Curated annotation (Swiss-Prot):
SUPFAM superfamilies reported for this sequence: Enolase C-terminal domain-like (SSF51604), Enolase N-terminal domain-like (SSF54826)
GO biological process: glycolytic process
Protein's recorded name: Enolase
Protein residues bound to Mg(2+): 246, 291, 318
Keywords: Cytoplasm, Glycolysis, Lyase, Magnesium, Metal-binding, Secreted
Name of encoding gene: eno
Localization (cell): Cytoplasm; Secreted; Cell surface
HAMAP family: Enolase (MF_00318)
Length: 433
């Protein structure tokens, strides 16, 4: 019943209007798994390769027909007849067939789409939800938790057409007792923030991830507006709601001068000065998580940043670790950061992703399952967060259906699991920071 009989790839459109890969895996007995992969805007240098056509006559060169052809050709031929229940085996077949370290032959977008579709088809054949199947694959059957969300409410950097340098300003509803309550709190603050922005004569258009994207003079002005919105929504900042930021500092780094540029504020920092600047922000505002606080290659700087901030807050590696077991292990050995952002398409298979989560947890690092700025309606990351008990999830704001699809899936999962999947709130962040 779990034997693969057909694999189909197709080119579909993501939330930015760019092509991406969707795959179907069909099993004997009529079971089907469907998966679509996302795409990032600010990407780490060592991510698995997202294969694009480069044909400027189609989608400005961003077509994915080569990746789709890989799915419909060599990948399909290699997988037909194999058992979809053996996820690791399926993923290893594709990795070996690709034959490159960064999946550049077929593209991580092709391989990941099939990897996830395989897991979904196997879950369907077993008659169980995807999160339950993932927990079984993870060796943690029937062990679930609901993730604390990082809700993006103001976009900047590469995710918005504005002058804000820091890429994401997020809230975490830490006083919530359930994911349902956390989402409600997030939505309320999101709406009150719109009122605050309008009252200050600012527009409320949104960026790639659904957060508002106004033009503001400084990062502190952003944080002050969020503070006002939280208070007007009836919550206490630092008690009910905490803050998180994604600096995406590789995008702020100037390799010619080895300096960090906040163009919106007209400020220039050395590596140590930028960490000191972030430290000042954490003292003024209840920021308990900072992602990519320095350039991905600034490991000496990260050692200093971890020394200064690592015992106080969560320091998240995204571009720093790119969901790579090898790079994460190096970071652990050097004592860099204390948390990792998990993005399926940075590594390219479900099996490798779960392995990285295990390595991080065993080292005492927190794990945050994440979307990308170019998303689809696929909700796999919600199931992955619950099935691996990752602890936290980052999937955008309270607008754009590509973001809300994941939140709504979490609501369904919580309804299904009830007390079997506790919502641990702030404990998920504090356990390592």
């Amino acid at each position: 019943m779990s034997k693969i009989v057909k694999v189909i790839g197709r080119e579909i459109i993501d939330s930015r209007g760019n092509p991406t890969v969707e795959a179907e895996v069909h099993l004997h007995g009529g079971f089907i798994g469907l998966a679509a992969v996302p795409s990032g805007a600010s990407t780490g240098s060592f991510e698995a390769l997202e294969l694009r056509d480069g044909d400027k006559s189609r989608f400005l060169g961003k077509g994915v027909t080569k990746a789709v052809s890989a799915v419909n050709g060599p990948i399909a031929e290699a997988l037909i007849g194999n058992n979809a229940k053996y996820q690791e085996c399926i993923d290893k077949i594709m990795i070996k067939l690709d034959g490159t370290e960064n999946k550049s032959q077929f593209g991580a977008n092709a391989i990941l789409a099939v990897s996830i579709a395989t897991a979904k088809s196997a879950a369907a054949s077993k008659g169980i939800p995807l999160y339950e199947h993932i927990a079984e694959l993870n060796g943690t059957a029937f062990q679930f938790s609901m993730p604390l969300p990082m809700i993006n409410i103001i976009n900047g950097g590469k995710h918005a057409d504005n002058n804000i340098d820091i890429q994401e300003f997020m809230i975490q509803p830490v006083s919530a007792k359930t994911i349902k309550e956390a989402i409600r709190i997030g939505a309320e603050v999101f709406h009150y923030l719109a009122k605050v922005l309008k009252a200050n004569g600012m527009h409320t258009t949104v960026g790639d991830e659904g957060g508002y994207a106004p033009n503001l003079d400084s990062n502190t002005e952003v944080l002050d507006l969020i503070t006002e919105a939280v208070e007007k929504a009836g919550y206490i900042l630092g008690k009910d709601i905490t803050l998180a930021i994604d600096c995406a500092a590789s995008e702020l780094f100037d390799p010619l001068t080895n300096k960090y540029l906040l163009k919106g504020e007209g400020k220039i920092f050395t590596s140590q000065e930028f960490t000191d600047y972030l430290n000042i922000l954490t003292k003024k505002y209840p920021i308990i998580s900072i992602e990519d606080g320095l350039n991905e290659s600034d490991w000496d700087g990260f050692m200093y940043q971890t020394k200064v901030l690592g015992n106080k807050i969560q320091l998240v590696g995204d571009d720093l670790f790119v969901t790579s077991a090898k790079i994460l292990q190096q970071g652990i050995e050097k004592g860099i950061a204390n948390s990792i952002l998990i993005k399926l398409n940075q590594i390219g298979t479900l099996t490798e992703t779960m392995a990285v989560i295990k390595i991080a947890k065993n080292a005492g690092y927190t794990t945050i399952i994440s979307h990308r700025s170019g998303e689809t309606e696929d909700t796999t990351i919600a199931d992955l967060a619950v099935g691996t008990s990752a602890g936290q999830i980052k999937t955008g704001s309270m607008s754009r259906s590509d973001r809300l699809a994941k939140y709504n899936q979490l609501l369904r999962i919580e309804e299904q699991l009830g007390k079997k999947a506790p919502f641990n709130g702030l404990k998920e962040v504090q356990s390592q920071a």
